[in-house]
């Protein structure tokens, strides 16, 4: 499972600065953080609707994950740092983690 995400992260990184006419990812990255954030919000809204209607949930979830990864790349946030943060939280209650912030 994580191998697929790792490949996607690498692909997104490799598209930065490429021809925007041949790659949707390159196009999104060229538009900057605000555009990527707006697209992510749009995709989250579509996922919300899909969950409520019990239709296309898997497809919309994949869209949200893709757009989240593109947004993180646009913002210069290293995905490995997020994985490390999640590993630190393993075995810790969500309530406990939130209290310790």
What does each of the following model-derived ranges do?
Residues 1-61, 65-101:
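Flexible "arm" and connector segments at domain edges
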